[in-house]
Amino acid sequence: MIRYCKIKHCIIGFDRPKICVPLVGRSAEEIIAQADQIRQSQRSSAIDMVELRGDYLDILPDYEVLDRLLAKVAEILPEKVLLFTIRSEAEGGEKLAFTTPTIYEINRHVIEKATADMVDIELFSGAEQAEEMIGIAKEKGVKIIMSNHDFQTTPDASTIVNLSLIHISEPTRPE
């Protein structure tokens, strides 16, 4: 079964693999400079999305600054899908002092404000919390990526499917 997801001009699950470039910096200024660099790049048209890595930011959990930063990145790169990610240390994220509840609250804020097109939620962050965020995301039009980073092994396909918290509906063709 093939499932498509359309965000802005980008159709995920259709055509070619998508190119996502991370925005990684400690400050809002560093992130904005990287977004400007992408915009000015001759290869900018090949980039489908940018991933703002919140686990590197020193500004968190200052929601006001985060909201302005996400809005500025979206303004600089209006054609790019904006993915927001806070990766926990256990799954390869930067070693900042974010507890699982803090990561949940930050992700929930971004989803409720719809300041990003997509938010990455770690599969094992808690089923109840993940389901709650997925429900809010559907209401707000924010797409969710459920991720799991196992650095020891790659599970077989049936295990990956069984880990899913979401029952995927019938496939759809992109518009």
Which residue stretches match the model-derived regions?
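Solvent-exposed alpha-helices and their adjacent loops that cap or buttress functional pockets
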Residues: I11-F14, I111-K113, L165
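Single conserved hydrophobic/aromatic residue that forms the stacking wall/gate
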Residues: I166-E175
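Redox- and metal-dependent alpha/beta enzyme cores, enriched for Fe-S-associated oxidoreductases
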Residues: A127-K140, M146-L165
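A generic structural motif
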Residues: R53-G54, M146-D150, R173
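N-terminal amphipathic alpha-helix/helix-capping segment at the start of soluble metabolic enzymes
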Residues: M1-I31
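Active-site beta->alpha loop and helix N-cap motifs at the rims of alpha/beta catalytic domains
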Residues: V21-S41, I47-E132, Q152
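A structural micro-motif
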Residues: P17, K80-V81, V142
